């Protein structure tokens, strides 16, 4: 061990800094043991004066399905912590009652503590967007032991696919836990100070923060019990949404299934297209022309030569034939999806995985080109297999996987255009598996490596209760649009007109126009290329469609 790795420095503002041994002399683990109060009322006043839009990071409405983990500190094996949702809420449906016990038996030089920790992976919060601070509702009582410590967890060296807890920045409030009644705590980002890092001068970089901790610290080293109520941890921004442009849908997805083929009520495609044109929608994107999910043995057009399901297994439900005939009669445009395949998430670094998908798409593209290359309504190709920017359960963040994906997209697009030279579309899902700026860089690298893809419609994920439309989407749209422009790909948005939630459980349903309107408003500030997923939840007679009809007519 070098002298550098043994270094112990006295740091007056924070107490002792200890440099712990790490893998190299460049990566020194700096650890401040002191507990200085960091409350700054002037900074709090500034946040309050400039706060505009906010985002809920954690609502504490439900104990089950939560994203955070409760535990005792590594040095606090005799302490205890538990929590449950209670109806005594300041916002929303519930609040979290945190019960804790101190035994005054720390096994290190640090005080005993209990903690709640949340690490962001997919669907993450990005604190760098018009940043001011955090807010948190807290209800304490005068008998509570301990002080409040909020930590931001950062990796200044974060790379796609890799994030490590390299830095902690702490905010300390020594009185809030003893205050009776609900108190709204404002925590300016400038009140966070380095607690642990790689170097004494590490700075808070909000774009590299990927989680937080809420600690209760036994500063006085006394035994005791307490209860604290928490509600509505929020990201506070200075961003004020302004919808200067009035957006319109120009196209819409349709997911084919046997119901549309077997039920006569769905035969009148001419009427559907006519109704769509009345509200400015003149294009449909058929998500896939073969298979998908439980209906993987179906070709949705006649004359299919698909053979990978086995002889006599593949069947035909030629809805596309009817759609193309109706489109020609009504002057409608159809973009045809290819094979309804999916990536093998366990083999994303294996070229053979992509070769199999390519071979199947070549068969489908060949079939469709023979039937529709000269059809006046055939407007383009859509590569059906859906990719994303996600971190887990598997994705393409690492360079080798990203390059295999870009090579695959290039091969499919190039082959399709060789059969019929029409524009090629893709529609990746925005899973927010990286901070917004890094996500934009990742899309930029992918698209610059990809040839013959003309349009990218970004799925907004607004139908899955996983995104804040006002905060998350503007942040990511800005960076990803820039990536598209620099790569020569046209940027569009794919708005989800459905809604469902895993937790709390909400069954799949169509959105109302009131729910859908803001998604459209946000997207329209970044592009005129706005599509809708999908016809199943946005069709004549539905509130979403009829509300949009009224909105569209009001723009004339």
Regions found by a protein language model. Name each.
Residues 43-48, 54-64, 236-290, 430:
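Boundary/entry segment of secreted carbohydrate-active catalytic domains
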Residues 340-341, 364-399, 531:
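Active-site groove signature of glycoside hydrolases
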Residues 27-245:
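Beta-rich carbohydrate-recognition modules and glycan-binding surfaces
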Residues 284, 379, 457-469, 479, ...:
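Substrate-binding cleft of secreted/luminal carbohydrate-active enzymes
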Residues 266-343, 399-426, 470-483:
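Aromatic-lined substrate-binding rim segments of carbohydrate-active enzymes
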Residues 19-22:
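C-terminal motif of bacterial Sec signal peptides marking the signal peptidase cleavage site
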Residues 315-330, 350-380, 415, 443-450, ...:
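An active-site-proximal structural segment forming one wall of the substrate-binding cleft
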Residues 335-347, 355, 380-386, 408-440, ...:
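Aromatic-lined carbohydrate-recognition surfaces of secreted/lumenal glycan-active proteins
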